[in-house]
């Protein structure tokens, strides 16, 4: 038996992990905004309230999207309280240890990229949250739009904790979803886990 290894192929595959760049400048913020408005299929809004940390995503030396976390939701989803076995008051007291994966938008479909990005985001989120806000980040929650199954989150071992009842009919101006049924699935992941 004989074997050969092609070092040129190995070299080509060295940078197969996505790189997340912390958004700091106005130019980078404009790029994030443009990606969301152009490519996010069901909530093409760049607006958010409260804390926020965004990253631009590069894969094989090409810009392929953005991902961001921000302040969690208040009032807290009942399923989250049940899952963590805490009261609304306990959640309020530890509010700054929760983040919401407020946006995740990829420009291209690349197999397994979404899961790799989520892992990188989790590895960076707690560090950046502590640096920027001086709070420990314990959980990241996300909401998945109706008609989507959250496959990328499931592949990264996030736990589906429930389903929302939708949004109120009066839809306050801060709500960015199309209708009261658009917001459905909720997933949560303790940060830094690598299962």
Model-found features: residue ranges?
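Short, structured coil/loop segments at alpha-helix boundaries
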Residues: 25-30, 81, 172, 191-192
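Short amphipathic alpha-helix that is part of the acyltransferase structural core
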Residues: 2-50, 56
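Intrinsically disordered, low-complexity and often Lys/Arg-enriched segments
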Residues: 1-4, 193-195
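Acyl-donor binding region in acyl/amide transferases
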Residues: 22, 51-53, 59-60, 66-186
């Amino acid at each position: 038996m004989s074997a050969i290894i092609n070092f040129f192929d190995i070299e080509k595959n060295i940078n197969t992990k996505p790189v997340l760049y912390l958004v700091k400048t106005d130019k980078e913020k404009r790029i994030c905004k443009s990606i969301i408005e152009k490519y996010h299929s069901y909530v093409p809004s760049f607006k958010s309230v409260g804390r926020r940390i965004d990253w631009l995503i590069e894969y094989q030396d090409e810009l392929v999207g953005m991902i961001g976390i921000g302040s969690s939701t208040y009032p807290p989803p009942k399923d989250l309280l049940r899952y963590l076995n805490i009261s609304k008051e306990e959640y309020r007291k530890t509010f700054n240890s929760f983040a919401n994966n407020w946006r995740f938008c990829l420009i291209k479909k690349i197999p397994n990229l979404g899961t790799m990005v989520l892992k990188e985001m989790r590895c960076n989120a707690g560090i950046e949250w502590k640096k920027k806000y001086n709070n420990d980040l314990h959980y990241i929650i996300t909401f998945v739009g109706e008609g989507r199954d959250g496959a990328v989150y499931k592949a990264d071992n996030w736990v589906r904790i429930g389903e929302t009842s939708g949004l109120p009919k009066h839809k306050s101006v801060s709500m960015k979803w199309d209708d009261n049924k658009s917001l459905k699935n909720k997933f949560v992941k303790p940060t830094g886990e690598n299962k």
